[in-house]
Amino acid sequence: MKITKIEKKKRLYLIELDNDESLYVTEDTIVRFMLSKDKVLDNDQLEDMKHFAQLSYGKNLALYFLSFQQRSNKQVADYLRKHEIEEHIIADIITQLQEEQWIDDTKLADTYIRQNQLNGDKGPQVLKQKLLQKGIASHDIDPILSQTDFSQLAQKVSQKLFDKYQEKLPPKALKDKITQALLTKGFSYDLAKHSLNHLNFDQDNQEIEDLLDKELDKQYRKLSRKYDGYTLKQKLYQALYRKGYNIDDINCKLRNYL
């Protein structure tokens, strides 16, 4: 087969053959196979050229994708599939990128976990889930997590939550709020509980009473639209109890409030 036309199209070259076949190739392909108009290719040469062209094109796509941030093997492979690169070509590209250290799932997991230690607020369980979603295997994640101390991060997150809710909740509710938030963020129950030891939950009676008054007013405005009488009183009691207020304090307030 003879090449009848070579035309540059942005980043690729259009090649037309005398059998009416056409294909797009990279500049690397042009150079490697010394392609030019009127060059004759046999079937083996043509197949080699097609394979290299897709390999070169796919690798360029992958490098572009990697130029924005670190990616996992799976993320790169999925990206190439979206661009219709053949599976056996994808496997070759991934191997090359690994050998050239463009992609490394273990390093990606390590970087992700270290960045979270500096700027994030996630515990090990959530971190593992996020890394698994990126296609990184457990055996690349678990050793790094096991060597990482999350106690200081848990304390930092708990302090931030404490500062946010201290003037809104009584001690018991505040402890429950912080503990639940830490569990949701992926910290263990033991680590969440331990982080509470560094916080001062002491509130004087007047502070607690003021919080109770505010919460009672808030719940009354909400519930009195639907309920009255004994039902309203029960609903108020339940709402305040769920917020962590003392039973005796609630009963005393409700007797004087209604």
Swiss-Prot record:
Record's keyword terms, sorted: Cytoplasm
The organism's place on the tree of life at top rank: Bacteria
Cytoplasm listed as a keyword: yes
TM region(s), chain numbering: none
Subcellular location: Cytoplasm
Keyword Plastid: no
Entry's Gene Ontology cellular component terms: cytoplasm
Signal peptide extent: none
GO biological process entries: regulation of DNA repair
Family: Belongs to the RecX family.
Function: Modulates RecA activity.
Protein's name in the database: Regulatory protein RecX
Organism: Streptococcus pyogenes serotype M49 (strain NZ131)
